[in-house]
A protein has these predicted regions:
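N-terminal targeting leaders
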Residues: 1-38, 45-48, 52-218
Length: 218
C-alpha cells in the first residue's frame, strides 16, 4: 500500500461560477456579490479560461475615474490601468492570461504556483484546457485542519510500517496541532533523514521533530 496525499481534485470547488468575455461590469459585480466570491474565471466559447476578473480589477477601474467633485488631483495612470478604466466588459477588465492548475497537482504544486504569480486562486483545467474547478488558498489550508489522530495513524501505518517496513512500536509518534515528534530506534542511521522527510510529506504535518537513534548492535 502506498501513501495517498490529497491533490487539487480532492480540494477544489467543482461548481464554478464563471463569466464570458462580453459580460458587462455591473453584471460581474452582481455575480461577485451574489455568490460571495472575490473573483471568477473568464472563459471562451469552449469553456477554457482566458483570464480572471476580481474585485481588485473592478476597483482599479473605479479608482481611475475622474473625481466628480474636482477635489482630487489627477494622478499619473499607467497605460494598463487606463485601459482598465475605459473597459466595460470582462475582456478588458480581466487579468490575463489565466494562471491555471490541473486536477492531479499536489497541494505543494498549487501553493507554489499561487505564490510565484501572487494570486489567491487558480482555475483548474483538464487535459483539453476546459474549466473543471477552482482551487483557492483557503482550500489548500484545509489540508492542515486534519485531526492529529489521522496524521498519527498515517505516519504509523503508511510511512513506518508499510513503506519503510519498520517493526511495530520501534518508533513512537506523537502529534499535537500538526507538529510531529518521533522517538525510538532504527536499524540504520541513514534511515533517520528518510523517515523525517516522508513524515514531512504527510498531509497536515506542520513540523517534524526527530529524536530517533540508530539501534545499538550490542
Amino acid at each position: 500500500m502506498t501513501m495517498q496525499h490529497r491533490c487539487v481534485s480532492d480540494l477544489m470547488t467543482r461548481d464554478v461560477v464563471r463569466t464570458g468575455r462580453d459580460t458587462p461590469f455591473k453584471e460581474i459585480a452582481k455575480l461577485l456579490m451574489e455568490y460571495d466570491i472575490t473573483a471568477l474565471p473568464v472563459v471562451d466559447d469552449a469553456d477554457r479560461p482566458v483570464g480572471v476578473v476580481s474585485e481588485a480589477d473592478l476597483l482599479r477601474k473605479e479608482a481611475q475615474q475622474p473625481d466628480p467633485a474636482g477635489l482630487l488631483p489627477a494622478a499619473h495612470t499607467p497605460h494598463a490601468d487606463r485601459a482598465k478604466a475605459e473597459a466595460i466588459t470582462a475582456e478588458g477588465l480581466m487579468t490575463s492570461p489565466a494562471v491555471v492548475s490541473h486536477p492531479e497537482w499536489s497541494v505543494v504544486e498549487a501553493a507554489r504556483e499561487m505564490e510565484s504569480h501572487h494570486v489567491k486562486r487558480l482555475p483548474v483545467v483538464d487535459d483539453s484546457g476546459r474549466l473543471v474547478g477552482v482551487i483557492s488558498r483557503a482550500d489548500l489550508l484545509r489540508v492542515f485542519l486534519r485531526r492529529d489522530s489521522a496524521i498519527r495513524e498515517e505516519i504509523q501505518g503508511d510511512v513506518l510500517t508499510r513503506t519503510l517496513g519498520l517493526a511495530p512500536y520501534s518508533v513512537t509518534v506523537h502529534v499535537v496541532d500538526g507538529r510531529v515528534t518521533l522517538k525510538g530506534t532504527v536499524e540504520q542511521a541513514n534511515l533517520i533523514p528518510v523517515v523525517e522527510r516522508l513524515c514531512r510529506g504527510v498531509d497536515g504535518v506542520v513540523d517534524v521533530r526527530s529524536d530517533l537513534e540508530q539501534k545499538s548492535s550490542a
